[in-house]
Amino acid sequence: MTYSRKKNPFVANNLLKKINKLNRKAKKEIIITWSRGSTIIPIMIGHTIAIHNGKEHLPIYIMDDMVGHKLGEFAATLNFRGHEKGDNKSRR
C-alpha cells in the first residue's frame, strides 16, 4: 500500500534541520544519518548523505531522479555472497 498523498512525506526532523542549515550556509558537507525511512525531497538535491546500512555509513550523492524514494533504498543491508560450490544438502 502506498503512502497517502494527503500526508506530507516523512523526513526526520534532525535530518531536515541539518540540510536547511547547510543550504543557508551554501556549504557541501557529508550528512550522516540513521534515518533510512526518510523520503528524499527536492531540497536534498546536490547533497551527499551517508546512510547507515547496519554496519557502516554509505555516502550517497542525491540526484534529481531520486526524489520521492526513501533513503534506505540506496543502502543495501544484505550481502549475498553466493552458495557454496560443493553444497549438495538440498538435493537429498
Swiss-Prot record:
<dbReference type="InterPro" id="IPR002222">
    <property type="entry name" value="Ribosomal_uS19"/>
</dbReference>
<dbReference type="GO" id="GO:0000028">
    <property type="term" value="P:ribosomal small subunit assembly"/>
</dbReference>
<dbReference type="InterPro" id="IPR020934">
    <property type="entry name" value="Ribosomal_uS19_CS"/>
</dbReference>
<keyword id="KW-0699">rRNA-binding</keyword>
<keyword id="KW-0689">Ribosomal protein</keyword>
<dbReference type="GO" id="GO:0019843">
    <property type="term" value="F:rRNA binding"/>
</dbReference>
<keyword id="KW-0934">Plastid</keyword>
<comment type="function">
    <text>Protein S19 forms a complex with S13 that binds strongly to the 16S ribosomal RNA.</text>
</comment>
<dbReference type="InterPro" id="IPR023575">
    <property type="entry name" value="Ribosomal_uS19_SF"/>
</dbReference>
<dbReference type="GO" id="GO:0006412">
    <property type="term" value="P:translation"/>
</dbReference>
<dbReference type="GO" id="GO:0003735">
    <property type="term" value="F:structural constituent of ribosome"/>
</dbReference>
<dbReference type="GO" id="GO:0005763">
    <property type="term" value="C:mitochondrial small ribosomal subunit"/>
</dbReference>
<dbReference type="InterPro" id="IPR005732">
    <property type="entry name" value="Ribosomal_uS19_bac-type"/>
</dbReference>
<comment type="similarity">
    <text>Belongs to the universal ribosomal protein uS19 family.</text>
</comment>
<protein>
    <recommendedName>
        <fullName>Small ribosomal subunit protein uS19c</fullName>
    </recommendedName>
</protein>
<dbReference type="Pfam" id="PF00203">
    <property type="entry name" value="Ribosomal_S19"/>
</dbReference>
<dbReference type="GO" id="GO:0009536">
    <property type="term" value="C:plastid"/>
</dbReference>
<keyword id="KW-0694">RNA-binding</keyword>
<keyword id="KW-0687">Ribonucleoprotein</keyword>
